[in-house]
């Protein structure tokens, strides 16, 4: 019997321990007004001193971390919420300068110590892993140092960091005063208690950060932090943390010291996942300690016995003082020169005398670098054969798209810049506006209006798109692009050949209007000018037969590509799709086949619900008319506009003359096309062809 009781007692103890462990794993909130018994994981300089969490001390180039030991479950599921809220009180004592700063951190693990230069990165990153998406770190920094590693120039700012020391958003430390109706600035490294509120709404995907000094003298009676929380947050940013967090995460703090030092204290902390954190009772929070003593140093040696001063000793002493002063000044000048050259090299641009005439359209590299947060991966909108495109925001609040391409000196950069300036003068509601450019070393940055709805290509072919375009929206986009091409071909001061018309180069603005973009292959020429044969460029399925045969781009080759574009939008498929059955592989041939069978409506995009059959038939016939193998049979853009608006009747077409193979061009046309290019020597090595979108 005694044995049975002992066995039962043993299993009861095991069950209690397991239950305690399970309950501990489910804890999603805590409050600390004192850290004496706090369940924290500490490393580096971090320690608990008299109930205060002491993150950093007077050690140089070191880090300190403190994390709550129990992980938080941030997996996305119907039963869990990604919302969280936290409050904490901190104080920073500057010892030499204001120190490097500290941060509230949500990280996938507690041990985030790095060797090397981590102290310059708030103890969160180092030079090798900064700006890596695999970091899975969200931090709110309280930065008291301006360093070359970060873009922010202020040594007293609050920032939201995602996987990098470069903040997604930042602002100088201040709080909104309801009585004065404005923001009031204060110092983070003030030796005084400062409150921080961080709230993330998982439904709205909105992160708010608010800061304010704790009132002095501190209330002796119970006094909740919520009563002094400013109405307006300092920072407010839309962030999808499900793309950052990696399931189980840890919450805590990170601090660091570089060559400048500071004591950083956390005096109270409240946290809750899935709701609002409990307000801290300020009457229970410990005051900041008295100013920490300066670093200890060995006692000075006893003074030597006094000797009567002599004129020689006085002269020697003056010489030493002068030498030390001159050496110090020289060192400071060298250091200043080094920092100046470092920043100058970092933001160095290429600027030649002939570019002065284009100066109103030049942007400084420094401003663009800040606008797109240092070419970070999370700012990347797309990439292709002509460079990468990043999203940015100018200080005025204007959103921009910046294309980063590498230019070839042999192309004649002066001519290229002149064409950029010409493109900057193009003004049409259905063109993506080029705002300006910047040259730096071997790269060129082109600045455009930002189009919030991305490319038409994405709407037509991305299966993950939540919403398809309606029939009326597609028709409106086709009409908009046609209007833009009429402007380029006939209404501007020169003839502009786009040479790369396709769905991936049509961008959609906030109202889903189509705008023709990507002028990377565009060419300008005067009206009546004989056209030169050039390197053959374009995309398979959009290139007119005479372009590949003769190497001369004209308005008719643009119209051929526009015809392929019309078919692409109406049919919801690319001009060439190798995975389809042979007779359907080439869209133009498939439409021609269905036209001859009198089953033209079979090619209309099956994703469309309701559509107007009469309009669809007109657009399909217009696409085929633009795609005739003989360029003389293709309409001009002015006639195309008339057909689209119903002001003219589209002529009857033959479905047997779709543009494939060698074109049927008259001798007169061939003579005109080759008049100035008889010396051109073409081979397949001269052809630059793209397949599909980019």
Swiss-Prot record:
Q: Indicate where this protein is primarily found.
A: membrane
| Transmembrane segments annotated in the record for this chain | 319-339
List the CDD domains: lectin_legume_LecRK_Arcelin_ConA, STKc_IRAK
Q: Which Pfam families match?
A: Lectin_legB, Pkinase
Q: Source species, please?
A: Arabidopsis thaliana
Renumbered residue ranges of the record's region Disordered: 283-314
Per UniProt, the keywords (alphabetical) are:
ATP-binding, Cell membrane, Glycoprotein, Kinase, Lectin, Membrane, Nucleotide-binding, Receptor, Serine/threonine-protein kinase, Signal, Transferase, Transmembrane, Transmembrane helix
The name under which this protein is listed is Putative L-type lectin-domain containing receptor kinase II.2
EC no. given is 2.7.11.1
Location in the cell reads:
Cell membrane
**A Gene Ontology cellular-component term:** plasma membrane
Kindly report every residue range on the membrane side named Extracellular: 25-318
**Compositionally skewed regions (Pro residues) per UniProt:** 289-309
Q: Which residues are glycosylated?
A: 57-58, 73, 131, 172, 183, 201, 208, 240, 246
Q: Which residues lie on this side of the membrane: Cytoplasmic?
A: 340-694
Per its record, what are the GO molecular function terms?
ATP binding; carbohydrate binding; protein serine kinase activity; transmembrane receptor protein serine/threonine kinase activity
Region Legume-lectin like: what ranges?
27-272
């Amino acid at each position: 019997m005694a044995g049975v009781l002992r066995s039962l007692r043993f299993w009861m103890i095991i069950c209690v321990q397991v239950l305690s462990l399970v309950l501990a794993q489910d804890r999603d909130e805590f409050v600390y007004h004192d850290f004496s018994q706090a369940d924290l994981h500490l490393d580096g300089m971090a320690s608990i001193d008299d109930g205060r969490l002491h993150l950093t001390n007077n050690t140089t180039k070191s880090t300190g971390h403190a994390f709550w030991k129990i992980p938080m479950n941030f997996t996305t599921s119907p039963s869990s919420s990604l919302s969280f809220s936290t409050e904490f009180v901190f104080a920073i004592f500057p010892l030499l300068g204001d120190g490097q700063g500290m941060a509230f951190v949500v990280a996938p693990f507690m041990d985030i110590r790095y060797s090397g230069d981590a102290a310059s990165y708030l103890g969160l990153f180092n030079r090798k892993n900064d700006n890596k998406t695999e970091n899975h770190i969200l931090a709110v920094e309280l930065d008291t140092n301006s360093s070359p590693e970060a873009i922010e120039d202020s040594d007293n700012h609050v920032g939201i960091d995602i996987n990098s020391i470069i903040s997604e958003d930042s602002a100088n430390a201040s709080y909104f005063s309801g009585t004065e109706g404005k923001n009031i600035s204060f110092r983070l490294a003030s030796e005084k208690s400062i409150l921080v509120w961080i709230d993330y709404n998982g439904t709205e995907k909105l992160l708010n950060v608010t800061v304010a000094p704790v009132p002095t003298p501190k209330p002796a009676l119970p006094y909740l932090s919520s009563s002094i929380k400013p109405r307006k947050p300092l920072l407010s940013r839309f962030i999808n943390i499900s793309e950052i967090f990696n399931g189980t995460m840890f919450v805590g703090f990170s601090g660091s010291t570089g060559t400048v030092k500071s004591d950083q204290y956390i005096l109270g902390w409240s946290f809750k996942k899935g709701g609002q954190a409990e307000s801290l009772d300020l009457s229970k929070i410990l005051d900041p300690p008295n100013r920490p003593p300066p670093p200890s140093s060995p006692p000075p040696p006893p003074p030597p016995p006094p000797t009567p001063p002599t004129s020689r000793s006085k002269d020697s002493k003056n010489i030493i003082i002068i030498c030390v002063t001159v050496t110090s000044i020289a060192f400071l000048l060298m250091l200043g020169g080094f920092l100046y050259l470092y920043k100058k090299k970092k933001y160095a641009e290429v600027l030649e005398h002939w570019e002065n005439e284009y100066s109103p359209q030049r942007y400084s590299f420094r401003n663009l670098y800040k606008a797109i947060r240092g070419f970070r991966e999370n700012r990347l909108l797309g990439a292709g054969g002509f460079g990468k495109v990043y999203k940015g925001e100018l200080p005025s609040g204007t959103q921009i798209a910046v294309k980063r391409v590498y230019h070839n000196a042999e192309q004649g950069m002066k001519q290229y810049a002149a064409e950029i300036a010409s493109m900057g003068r193009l003004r049409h509601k259905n063109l993506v506006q080029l705002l300006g450019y910047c040259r730096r070393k071997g790269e060129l940055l082109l600045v455009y209006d930002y189009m919030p709805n991305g490319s038409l290509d994405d709407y037509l072919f991305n299966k993950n798109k939540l919403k398809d375009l309606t029939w009326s929206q597609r028709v409106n986009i086709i009409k908009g692009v046609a209007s833009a091409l009429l402007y380029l071909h006939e209404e501007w001061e020169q003839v502009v050949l786009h040479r790369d018309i396709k769905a991936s180069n049509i961008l959609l603005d906030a109202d889903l209007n189509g705008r023709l973009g990507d002028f990377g292959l565009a060419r300008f020429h005067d009206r009546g000018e004989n056209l030169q044969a050039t390197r053959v460029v374009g995309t398979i399925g959009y290139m007119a037969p005479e372009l590949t045969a003769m190497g001369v781009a004209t308005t008719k080759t643009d119209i051929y590509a526009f015809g392929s574009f019309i078919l692409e939008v109406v049919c919801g498929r690319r001009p060439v799709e190798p995975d389809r059955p042979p007779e359907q592989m080439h869209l133009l041939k498939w439409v021609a086949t269905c036209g001859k069978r009198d089953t033209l409506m079979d090619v209309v995009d099956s994703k469309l619900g309701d559509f107007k059959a009469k309009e669809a038939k007109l657009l399909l016939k217009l696409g085929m008319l633009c795609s005739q193998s003989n360029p003389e049979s293709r309409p001009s853009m002015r006639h195309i506009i008339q057909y689209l608006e119903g002001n003219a009747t589209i002529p009857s077409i033959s479905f047997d003359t779709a543009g494939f193979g060698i074109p049927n061009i008259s001798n007169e046309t061939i003579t005109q096309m080759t008049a100035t290019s008889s010396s051109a020597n073409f081979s397949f090595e001269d052809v630059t062809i793209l397949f599909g979108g980019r």
